[in-house]
């Protein structure tokens, strides 16, 4: 799993973003609280990170209560990264 986090950091995600994305791949949809526990990061940091990932369109949020989050597929993330490099 550390290799995956390092790979995500190489494509531009910071440490928290990589941990949150990996946690979401393991369990989705998930709440911010669940993600903070899975990623082993502070809950407040999880919500900040989820917002940043949502703004980058790497994570989508629901319009439910509680809000749940879903990651984009890894293939889509890879495709976006390749497009970014070639442009």
Model segments located where?
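Long, low-complexity, charged/polar intrinsically disordered regions in eukaryotic proteins
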Residues: 1-5
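Short, cationic-aromatic polyanion-contact patches
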Residues: 6-17, 31, 58-84
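Short alpha-helical "packing" element that flanks the helix-turn-helix/winged-helix DNA-binding module
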Residues: 17-24
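Short capping segments at the starts of secondary-structure elements
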Residues: 25-31
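A short acidic, leucine-rich amphipathic alpha-helix
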Residues: 34-39
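Alpha-helical DNA-recognition elements
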Residues: 49-56
């Amino acid at each position: 799993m550390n290799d995956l986090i390092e790979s995500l950091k190489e494509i531009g995600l910071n440490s928290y973003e990589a941990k949150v994305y990996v946690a979401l791949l393991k369990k989705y949809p998930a709440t911010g609280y669940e993600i903070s526990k899975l990623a082993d990061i502070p809950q407040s940091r999880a919500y900040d990170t989820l917002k940043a990932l949502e703004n980058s369109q790497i994570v989508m949020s629901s319009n439910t209560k509680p809000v749940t989050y879903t990651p984009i597929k890894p293939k889509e993330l890879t495709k976006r990264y390749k497009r970014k490099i070639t442009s």
